[in-house]
C-alpha cells in the first residue's frame, strides 16, 4: 500500500483561482525542493505523518465535501501523489493539484485540475520552472503567478505573450 507524508488535512473555503468560494478538503503533503522567498508554508518542508492512500480516502469521505485540493510544499515531490490524485478522482471527487511547475505535470491524471504556480524571478526560484509543463496544460488547468514587483509582472506578461504567439 502506497504511503504519503502528510503535513495536515483540513476543510476550508477556496480563496483563489476559478473555484473561489467552494468548500474543499485540503491535503497538504510534506516536502518541497524549492525555497521561494515569500513561502507561507515553510512548516510543510519537514515533519508530517505517514498516511496510506486508504487513510486519506477515509479523511476525504468523512469531510463530506466534494472538492479536494492536494497541495504542499510541492506535492509532486512524492511519487505516490499521482496515485492519490487518481484514487480521489476514481472515488468521485473533483480534484485540484497546486504545484510549483518545477516538476513534470504530464503524468497527472487528466481529470485533475492542475494549478501551476510558475515561479517569477523575484521568488528566488525562477530558474527552476519546467516550462515544458505549459505545453501539456489544457483549458481545465490554471496558471498562477505570485508577483513581487513590476519586474515579475513584466516577466509573466512577456511569458504569456510568447506562449500565446
Task: Report the location of each language-model feature.
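Short linear functional motifs in flexible/disordered or boundary regions
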Residues: 18, 48-51, 68, 126, ...
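Conserved AdoMet/S-adenosylmethionine-binding subsite of the radical SAM
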Residues: 77-165
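Short Cys/His-rich Zn2+-coordinating modules
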Residues: 13, 17-21
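Conserved Radical SAM active-site core
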Residues: 4-11, 23-26, 34-113
Amino acid at each position: 500500500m502506497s504511503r504519503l507524508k502528510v503535513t495536515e488535512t483540513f476543510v476550508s473555503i477556496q480563496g483563489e483561482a476559478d473555484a473561489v468560494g467552494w468548500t474543499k478538503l485540503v491535503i497538504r503533503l510534506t516536502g518541497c525542493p524549492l525555497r521561494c522567498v515569500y513561502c507561507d508554508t515553510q512548516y510543510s518542508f519537514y515533519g508530517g505523518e505517514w498516511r496510506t492512500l486508504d487513510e486519506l480516502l477515509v479523511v476525504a469521505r468523512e469531510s463530506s465535501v466534494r472538492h479536494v485540493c492536494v497541495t504542499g510544499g510541492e506535492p509532486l515531490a512524492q511519487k505516490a501523489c499521482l496515485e492519490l490524485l487518481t484514487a480521489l478522482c476514481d472515488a468521485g471527487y473533483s480534484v485540484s493539484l497546486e504545484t510549483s511547475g518545477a516538476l513534470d505535470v504530464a503524468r497527472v491524471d487528466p481529470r485533475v485540475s492542475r494549478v501551476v504556480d510558475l515561479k517569477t524571478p523575484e521568488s528566488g526560484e525562477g530558474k527552476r520552472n519546467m516550462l515544458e509543463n505549459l505545453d501539456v496544460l489544457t483549458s481545465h488547468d490554471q496558471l498562477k503567478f505570485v508577483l513581487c514587483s513590476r519586474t515579475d509582472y513584466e516577466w509573466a506578461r512577456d511569458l504569456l505573450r510568447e506562449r500565446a504567439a
